[in-house]
Design a protein with these regions (language model features):
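C-terminal non-catalytic interaction modules
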Residues: 31-69, 73, 77, 249-305
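Residue signature of alpha-solenoid helical repeat architecture, marking inter-repeat boundaries
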Residues: 59, 94, 129, 134-136, ...
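Residue register of alpha-helical TPR repeats
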Residues: 63, 91, 95-98, 133, ...
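"A position-specific structural signal for the A-helix of alpha-solenoid helical repeats
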Residues: 67, 95, 99-102, 137, ...
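Short coil/turn connectors between adjacent alpha-helices in alpha-solenoid helical repeat scaffolds
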Residues: 70-74, 100-116, 142-158, 186-196, ...
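Tetratricopeptide repeat
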Residues: 81, 114-117, 121, 157-164, ...
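Short coil/turn linkers that connect adjacent helices within long alpha-helical scaffolds
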Residues: 88-90, 125, 166-172, 205-213, ...
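TPR/Sel1-like alpha-solenoid repeat signature
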Residues: 178-186, 199, 216-227, 239, ...
């Protein structure tokens, strides 16, 4: 699935210049989050993707609400995006929950709001797919709390994702996202790279089958991370480059800086430093989000005599 690297950048990547389409009037009327004043006039997109779930599926229809939600989400404005969604149906409640859960993972804030939204989604779920999707979000919220050392909820995460696996049929649209999340749990909590790789490959196949480009950007990146750990530099570079390419094409701003940093880890100087500088610039434009990226962007300690 990964091999030679036809996508590795040979010329400077300019993440600002890659967003060339101006913001539409309808979008400017709803983009009022704290980051928007910094980004207006710098970044924009035309027909961008939107997703109903966290990392689960992208489409490019003309639904103004979903386009606005996507644009806010991509700029790290999850609260503003969630405020546009009335939780009056199971699907709407699940989408709102997914946004607030993603906010927790990227900002280390908003845990109570995400939990409240999740309880609403769980109460409204009627079908196996809806109950499975809610369980998947519970697993993700518990995983994020554990990973970020808010509270150890590893057992809850495993149980919730296991419950989701019993409810979401193989081949269903939500199964690829579930497989991916089981992969990150295996990699980062269980410390089982073999199980993680198998889960990521299932997720990648499912994301490809359902034309889920955003999820593919995550599976490419995590498979590349495992390849880098194994010393497979060319394979890792290819995967990281694919992840970055997809995120730039979709306009997924909040995920672009991490993708730049990951690719930098496979490059030699001066390219590695240039990629990290671009990542730092975007990180600052987004108000220091994702918070955990600050540790990777920090300059190395000065050498002492």
């Amino acid at each position: 699935m990964v091999g030679e690297d036809p996508c590795a950048p040979s010329a400077p990547h300019d993440f600002v210049n890659s967003f060339t389409h101006p913001l539409g009037r309808a979008t400017e009327s709803v983009l009022r989050c704290g980051h928007h004043s910094k980004l207006k006039g710098v970044l924009g997109e035309g027909n961008v993707a939107h997703t109903a779930m966290s990392g689960n599926g992208t489409t490019a229809d003309d639904d103004p609400l979903q386009t606005a939600v996507w644009r806010l989400r991509s700029r790290a404005c999850w609260v503003d995006a969630a405020a546009l969604i009335e939780p009056d149906t199971p699907q709407a409640s699940l989408q709102r929950t997914a946004l607030l859960v993603e906010r927790c993972l990227y900002t280390e804030q908003g845990w109570e709001e995400a939990e409240d939204a999740l309880r609403t989604a769980e109460a409204q779920a009627r079908t196996d797919d809806e109950r499975g999707a809610a369980a998947c979000e519970r697993g993700q919220l518990a995983y994020a709390a554990t990973l970020l050392h808010v509270r150890d909820r590893a057992d809850e995460a495993r149980a919730a994702l296991g419950r989701a696996a019993a409810l979401i049929a193989p081949g269903a649209p939500g199964r690829a996202l579930l497989d991916f999340r089981r992969g990150v749990l295996a990699e980062n909590l269980a410390r089982s790279p073999q199980a993680a790789r198998a889960a990521y490959r299932r997720a990648h196949a499912g994301a490809t089958a359902h034309d889920d480009l955003l999820l593919q950007s995550f599976t490419w990146r995590h498979l590349a991370g495992l390849a880098l750990r194994d010393g497979e530099l060319a394979e890792a570079r290819h995967g990281f480059a694919e992840s970055l390419r997809i995120r730039e094409e979709l306009g997924y701003l909040v995920g672009t800086a991490p993708a730049l940093v990951a690719l930098a880890d496979t490059e030699s100087e001066p390219e590695a430093s240039r990629l990290r500088e671009e990542a730092g610039r975007l990180f600052r434009l987004l108000g220091g989000v994702p918070t955990w990226l600050s540790r990777q962007l920090a300059p190395p300690p000065a050498a002492t005599a």
